[in-house]
Amino acid sequence: MEIVLKFDKKELQRVKEILLKDDVVSRASIVFKDGEIIGKEGYYCYISGLEEHCKRALELTKDIAEEAEEGEKNKVIEKIKEEGEKANEGFGAIFG
């Protein structure tokens, strides 16, 4: 399951603390990105994991973050995956 949370930049540290310190959520793959990657304000948190991880993340951040709309979510996920592929290509070139 994949979700993307959207929140204000001023809440970045708080959201990181909440999610990364939680025993359930911290088992998921978590990536934080500035909204500028898709031309938006704020910050995004991409979470990929089991349904249990994603539901817990939503529950823990319900007062400071919201789930991104489908279009935004897809753009953020696409950008993150593109960056991952580019990093892997660079890594492959080093050890190629």
Could you describe each region identified by the protein language model?
Residues 1, 29-40:
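Short, flexible, solvent-exposed loop/turn segments with mixed acidic/basic and small polar residues
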Residues 77-95:
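Short, low-order "capping/linker" segments at domain edges
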Residues 28-31, 63-81:
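Conserved short beta-strand edge segments in small beta-sheet-based binding/regulatory domains
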Residues 18, 27, 31, 55, ...:
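Long, contiguous binding/interaction regions
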Residues 7-33:
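Short amphipathic alpha-helix segments
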Residues 16-23, 54-66:
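Short amphipathic alpha-helices in soluble, non-transmembrane regions
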Residues 2-6, 10-15, 67-71:
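Long, compositionally biased, intrinsically disordered regions
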Residues 8-12, 48-55:
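Helix N-cap motif at beta-to-alpha junctions
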